[in-house]
């Protein structure tokens, strides 16, 4: 075992394989602190991870360590020893880091890529509009709009409707039961990324002999009849086999291509026949009660029948693949024309641009020019959670990292990850990149494993080691995995081995689902969860299980939080009642909403406050809302009855009232908009102590809980072959035929084998992640095997059953380590307090009046704009937006009056000097929005061009505000009277942002090609 205390954290190129709980965030923080302490500038360090939460934790870790070291000599000495530093002034290091935080590249890979594309959008070919990143609900809404447009009547006008529907019918061949929109959404979700990254990939596996699909219907009856006619020559070994064989032949005869009938056959003999034909052996030995051989005319006819059906199924899959490509291509063309060409890009588009250099020489040269400019600003790379890195991520990063890692020791690479926690393969994570780094890209990189746990006590690790270290059982159940599972036993850090830190682990049997939930409640009650100062996580595989278990625990008195996020409008009864109140206010004719209100406790309060007549009630309440906003009137309705609600219900009501107060601040008084506001509301939450957090295992990654319960260990075989949707070869991609057909296609069979090996590895990693969340208590519930249970099935449940069992196992408890009363070592919480009242909300903030800087111009001189003049002005602004620094690149201008005017501006020596960088450190912004509070009003405007001059330390010393004016004035100086108010408003705003800088407003007269300084 490698001792992490021996790791030289400042080794130039270092790969740390950090097991769960071993302190990877700690090592990342030490690396950054060491680099800065050695004199490296924080802004030349890039640290990338996969979630904003992880990035925030990393930043907190760095600042907390530095603050402790700066204030405590003992902490300073310990940090120096761990990092390998000479005596260090951590006050200075802390100050350096804090000053550099705005320029410190700490965040997600996605945000880093977006930052690069935003900085070099024109170099990346985004010229149709300003780069705008689509993410979250906005991205989903736009995708839905495009999907709707694909199947809308607008396609008729484009002449695409018949083409699209034809492709779609082929894509859904044999699967017509799905709705059009549902099927299309599934295709897009499954295939769009494949399409964008498949420029040189064949759609459909090679070497497949296509047949006419009609051949099956033409020949199946002849072949089936021949098979039945020859049955008498078969030597049966059981009298029941004759009828069974006839039934199977009829079942095969009744099969329809694409229907999936044979895949779902309940007849064991039919399955036997399909498997026997797939082996391509000379004789067909099958089993029905006993083994017997299908030979003679019957055997030949059955073999020919099954092989013909398989060929037709393969052809159908190939045609579906081609049709899917056509459907996704139409969708992608709409994305290109409606989004990407206009600068609207999602994270996947950004990754595509960052990895485009691999596709052709022109793209490589373009990326090389961009990297040359970026490379000088980055010396040190830190990559976190490397097992979750996708090939798309790596392709985008590698050109930059390659420069740093192959340079001298002044430039470094630090990678940390854990192969055993690779649970995001389904979204592209490629654990094989570890091998690619060590074997191909950086064969000289130092590798250091970490197995000591700073999270889990010895009793928890005993169970983890027993299960995850049992590679013999793993291999016998699961066979080969990709990659292979590597294990070394974990040990607890010394401070966790003291008697006061000990814990307990147990694996026990449950009889059924009802018993599972009741036993879970009993375990949490036995441990006094909610009464002692400890955290508890209940981890499951699916969102449906999260909901089921949360509701059951809540009904049994536990304070429960799901998934770390809450939806207060829909996940509780008070929230539903409040939402329906808003629905009724939005539409008083909504009978359902009113019915919910009449059955809820809100009805009596509404009558007391606003009268018994519902029409008068609606008018009274909407009148109050028009005066006070939504939060105050609704708080008056809720508060009188909230005292009778659970703590959970009161929290949810407070969430909604706070959200409505935020909505009131927008100035909107529409009940419909208010309803949509709270229905979309999701609030991040921290469970704290005394709360039970129920979440999926994926969501739990990176977290730790004093108590972990795993009540739903899957007993299904791994993998579930019905989830094999895309077959991939080195140079091809295909939709998948039914499972029985795949055995008859070597290419697809091999592709499925690779997929299955990866699925098995990910399932093993999933269980490892779940087990290693536990600090002090780990409780696993397993279904008790029945008489017909296949205990050799490749399931996670069987793995635990085989590995955890020992000589002390009983009928109730399979494994146990430690003392069940360990929780008494944890202090109790304070006695329960009285129910907390609804929080008092501040008065809603009135929406500020909005003004624009252009309203500040002198109205007596305001020109009257003609449509042609406005069009000319818009064209000039659009062309000038494309102008970067003319000493770096010359803009390509079209032939137009506006282009001639822009060319004239660039030719002017005084204006040209303003548009040149001349090697200075200047940040350039075009069409920059500017918002500020001026005299109590919200000022909002767009600055045509903004220059921020920085000194050698990065401080802004001069700000140039540049506005282009196309007014037909007699003299350029006539613009001063017209626009001095507007420019002074901009100047005042920028002066507040940069108080120590010189702020210079500049007008450019397009008509006279002159500069005017104000």
Model segments located where?
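Accessory N-terminal region flanking or inserted into the helicase ATPase core
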Residues: 1-17, 27, 44-46, 123-131, ...
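Nuclease catalytic cores
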Residues: 55, 59, 461, 692, ...
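Conserved ATP-driven helicase/translocase motor core recognized via long
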Residues: 19, 44, 177-345, 716, ...
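Conserved motor-region signature of P-loop NTPase helicases/translocases
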Residues: 1-64, 137, 141, 145, ...
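Accessory C-terminal helicase-associated subdomains
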Residues: 322-326, 340-344, 501, 526-532, ...
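Conserved ATP-dependent motor core of P-loop NTPases, especially the RecA-like helicase ATPase domain
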Residues: 5, 9-11, 49, 66-259, ...
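C-terminal accessory regions
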Residues: 607-632, 686-692, 740-800
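Flexible, glycine/threonine-enriched loop-and-boundary segments that flank and lead into catalytic domains
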Residues: 355-380, 392-407, 675-699, 908-948
